[in-house]
Amino acid sequence: MEVLKVASDSNPNSVAGALAGVIRECGGTAEMQAIGAGAINQAIKAVAIARGFVAPGGLDLICIPAFTDIMIDGEERTAIRIIVEPR
């Protein structure tokens, strides 16, 4: 599964397009990763926008948030992992 990394300066419309594309092409689940309040805000906005993108095709999306530990520059950080899948 491809992980979409979202930053606080990510454009939510662009992330939503990528998210909708992954869901349509892979026929199921996408995963996003965000660190920090700004990045999480952009990721959640992207889910809301992506719901509008896939709705005409008869899909609705749900997201499942979870914590995950990742390594950045040799340092362990806690990120939010958001699994997005059709309902």
Predicted regions and their residues:
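Short beta->alpha linker loops
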Residues: 10, 35-38
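Short, hydrophobic/π-rich interface segment
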Residues: 37-63
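Conserved mixed alpha/beta catalytic, RNA-binding, or beta-rich assembly cores of soluble enzyme
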Residues: 1-29, 43, 47, 51, ...
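C-terminal edge-of-domain segments
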Residues: 55-87
